Structures are given as structure tokens and as C-alpha cells.
A protein has these predicted regions:
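Intrinsically disordered, low-complexity serine/threonine-rich segments
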Residues: 6, 22, 37, 156, ...
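Ser/Thr-rich, Proline-interspersed low-complexity disordered segments
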Residues: 32, 407, 415-465
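Extreme N-terminus of proteins, especially the signal/transit-peptide cleavage junction
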Residues: 16-17, 30-38
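Bacterial N-terminal signal peptides
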Residues: 22-32
Length: 466
């Protein structure tokens, strides 16, 4: 496949760019100094899309089998979008079986706090997982022309919006250094000023974009639908390289340690590329389409495929570490999530689209052994529903939206039953026995008067026994 140049490119620079980046950096430092918890603010956790929460300490392979449903909330429309977490709130979007809204829920109770936009219409489609930073939630919705919104995270009020091209938006945004990166199905990729929505740069590339952009080390990576993995300069939009891959592409890339990892549908492979040059480092072949996005941590790449298998590969060599038939015959639309030694993934639908697995699975990341599984949701007949969102793990709870019936579920551990503290029975204090007063000593008839004997003092009172 020949090297393809962008069709159009427009680069704009904002004079206060350095000031904006400094302000954001100072805010991040202040949050860290105050002990703020690192939230799950993106599709796949962070702008690099590694799919790993390094801060999780509560759930582990030792206790994840004890997960139970803490709450379920029906938001009225099926969700392809995953959940983002920010300062005690969960944000997700319904895909359009209702009206394509952004929803904010209380993470402790599942109570819905607000929805946006207020003028949402039935048939609007919101496919994107929100990105959250500095009190602003960013997401895209097709109305039917795509619109990118910035919404106040506390109130649900609009901050700004940006109207996209005549296309669709199914990619989730990435936010870093004050720039919001969004991609559209016509192949246009844009960098917007996160504070006001102003276009910083805009490029259009053949092939279209159904995957989400990952950003790391000043470069943006995105799997173009029919051309391959594209790398752009994150500051200017200039093309750096294009690595051909057979299309179409749905997997979103993940970046770690100078490598970019992505799945490929038609040839059933996982690819590893050099992040700087675009050279192919290795490929590994699975048993079926790979439409999920990889999770990468500590030199291991995890990914699922359309046969219900989950794979773990050596990130440096591509060697297979383990393969686990988690949900045979069911396609994984959900991407794996890693946290504290546990790999989470949800299953969806069989090849003939007649059966739904609809379960959340938790695997031992070291061995692939299934430690836990349960239905994310069930309908009135007890049949499982279709799950396409990826799990979000935060502070001991796994959150996952459901496409089939529009519920968001939270799985966590039950609080341990407190052990009663026995009340100590006091020991009775024994009564002291008084010392008797001695009788007077008779006096003999002396020739001289003798000195009287002193009266004996009372004995000491005995101490009670412990």
C-alpha cells in the first residue's frame, strides 16, 4: 500500500499556548500535592490508552471472586460508551435507543445527577466515552451532524460546542496539554483548544476513523479505517508516518515504552510498531477478528478477539504468554482492563447475532484463569444482554454500562461484617478483713511503774486479685 499524504491540512497556533499549558500543569501539581485520587478520565484510562489503572489497591486476585452488584441504574438508552470517573461522579453516554445524552451519576449510589443536552432528540447517537479534566466533560454526539461538547462536570451546563464535518463521530476524545483531539468517520482529525473549542489544527486523511486517537510523547496515533496506523505530530498535525494494515480497523492503539500496539480485524492479528519510526516490530496471529483495543502493562499486551478468547503476549517479542477461552463462541466488543493483577473484560454476542453472553469476567492477569463472572444485566426473561462497553475500575469498584437495556452496573465487595468486641466482666473487689484490736495487757504490782506497751497498728488492706 502506497504512502498516503493528508488531503488537506490547516494549522493554527494560539498565542497563549504556553500560558495555557503552564496553568494546566500547575493545577495538576496542586492536585497531586493535595492528595487527590487519580481518577479514570478517558477511554482506556488515559490519553495513551493503556487500559490500566495503576492506582487500584482494593480489588486483587485474592478477593475478586467476591464481587457483587452494588447498584444498577437504567439511563434509558443502550451504551457503547464506557464510563469515566471524576471526583465522585461517573460519566457515560447513551448510544441512541433513547436520545443520545451524556449522563452523570453518583458513583456511590448510582443516582442520576444530570443529563445533557436538554434539547436532545430521539435518534441522536452518542458513541464516545467522555474525557474529563479540570471540571469539564468532553464528548461527541451525532445530531445527526457530529457535535463535540464541553460540559461543566458539576452542573451539566454547556461550556462550548464545536460542530464537526458532515460525517459521524464514533471515536472517543483524547485530552492532554490543553488540547482536545477528536476524529470523524470522513477521515478528519482535529485538535481543539480545550478551554474554548477553537480549532488549533485540522487534517483530513483518506480511510476514515472509527478507532480513537491515542496521544503520548508529542505524537498522536490512530488506526485509520481502511489504510493503517497513522502517526501525527500532536502539536501541528503534520504526518509523521503511516504503517499499512489491512482494513477495516476498529481497534484503538495503546502506547507504552516506545511501542504502539493495535489489533487488526481482517487478518486476525495483533501488531506492535516502533512509536518513532512506524516500523513493524512483531505481529501475532489470533483465531478470529480483533476489534478490541489492547491493555498494556509491565511488558505484557492483553487483547480479546471475536471467538471469545483472551490473549497475553510479551510486549517486546510478541511471544504468547497465555491464551484463555473465556467465552467461546461470543465476540468481545469490550476491551480488556487491567488493575492490580486482575484483567476485566465483558462479552457480547455470538456470530449469528442470536445469543448474548452479557457477562463481566475477571481473570488472573498472570495465568488467564477466570476468577469471577456474572451478568452485567438481565431482561425480564432472565436472558443476558449485550455488553459492548469496556470495564472501568476505580477504588475497589468495577463500573460497566450495558448496551442491551441501558443500565449502568457497579460491582464491588461487600463491607466486612464488624466483629463484636466482647465487654470485659469486672472482677469483684474483695472486702478487707479488719485487724482486731488486741486486749489490754494486765499490769503486775511493780516496785516501779513500767512504760506502757504501744498499741499495734492495723494491718494493710489486701489488694484485690486481677
Amino acid at each position: 500500500m502506497e504512502f498516503v499524504k493528508p488531503v488537506t491540512q490547516m494549522v493554527r497556533y494560539v498565542p497563549d499556548r504556553r500560558f495555557r499549558m503552564c496553568a494546566i500543569l500547575c493545577a495538576a501539581i496542586a492536585a497531586t500535592a493535595s492528595g487527590a485520587r487519580a481518577d479514570w478520565t478517558h477511554f482506556r484510562f488515559d490519553p495513551a490508552h493503556r487500559g490500566v489503572n495503576p492506582n487500584e489497591t482494593i480489588l486483587s486476585p485474592a478477593n475478586v471472586a467476591n464481587l457483587t452488584v452494588k447498584w444498577r441504574t437504567n439511563i434509558g438508552g443502550g451504551c457503547f460508551a464506557s464510563a469515566s470517573i471524576f471526583e465522585g461522579k461517573l460519566y457515560t453516554a447513551d448510544t441512541g435507543s433513547a436520545d443520545g445524552k451524556l449522563h452523570a451519576l453518583d458513583i456511590a449510589t448510582g443516582q442520576e445527577l444530570w443529563t445533557f443536552p436538554p434539547d436532545a432528540l430521539r435518534g441522536d447517537h452518542a458513541w464516545t466515552t467522555p474525557a474529563v479534566a479540570n471540571g469539564i466533560v468532553y464528548f461527541g454526539v451525532n445530531r445527526p451532524i457530529p457535535v463535540v461538547y464541553a460540559v461543566n462536570a458539576a452542573t451539566g451546563h454547556e461550556v462550548w460546542h464545536h460542530t464537526g464535518p458532515i460525517a459521524n463521530i464514533v471515536s472517543s476524545p483524547a485530552l492532554i496539554d490543553g488540547l482536545l483531539y477528536v476524529a470523524f468517520t470522513d477521515g478528519s482529525i482535529r485538535a481543539l483548544d480545550a478551554t474554548n473549542g477553537q480549532v488549533i489544527w485540522n487534517v483530513t486523511h483518506v480511510g476514515g476513523a472509527n478507532s480513537s486517537p491515542a496521544v503520548a510523547d508529542g505524537r498522536l496515533y490512530i488506526a485509520m479505517h481502511n489504510s493503517g496506523l497513522l502517526a501525527l505530530d500532536a502539536n501541528t498535525g503534520s504526518e509523521l508516518w503511516l504503517a499499512p494494515m489491512p482494513g477495516p480497523q476498529w481497534s484503538s492503539p495503546a502506547v507504552e515504552n516506545g511501542r504502539v500496539f493495535v489489533g487488526s480485524r481482517d487478518d486476525h492479528k495483533v501488531y506492535a510498531f516502533d512509536a518513532v519510526t512506524g516500523n513493524t516490530l512483531w505481529t501475532a496471529t489470533t483465531s478470529d477478528w480483533v476489534q478490541t483495543s489492547p491493555a498494556v502493562s509491565n511488558g505484557v499486551v492483553y487483547i480479546g478477539n471475536n471467538s471469545g478468547n483472551v490473549y497475553a503476549y510479551n510486549a517486546e517479542t510478541g511471544g504468547l504468554i497465555w491464551q484463555s477461552p473465556v467465552a467461546p463462541g461470543f465476540a468481545f466488543g469490550s476491551s480488556p482492563t487491567l488493575a492490580n493483577g486482575v484483567l476485566y473484560i465483558a462479552s457480547a454476542i455470538n456470530a449469528s447475532a442470536t445469543e448474548f453472553d452479557g457477562k463481566l469476567y475477571a481473570l488472573d492477569a498472570a495465568t488467564g484463569q477466570v476468577l469471577f463472572s456474572d451478568f452485567v444485566s438481565e431482561n425480564d426473561e432472565g436472558e443476558a444482554r449485550w455488553v459492548n462497553a469496556s470495564p472501568t475500575v476505580d477504588n475497589g469498584v468495577v463500573y460497566i454500562p450495558n448496551y442491551g437495556d441501558g443500565t449502568v452496573a457497579a460491582f464491588g465487595l461487600n463491607a466486612p461484617t464488624p466483629t463484636p468486641t466482647p465487654t470485659a466482666t469486672p472482677t469483684a473487689t474483695p472486702t478487707a478483713t479488719p485487724t482486731p484490736t488486741p486486749s489490754a495487757t494486765p499490769t503486775a504490782t511493780p516496785t516501779s511503774t513500767p512504760r506502757p506497751r504501744p498499741t499495734p497498728k492495723p494491718g494493710p488492706t489486701p489488694r484485690p486479685r486481677p
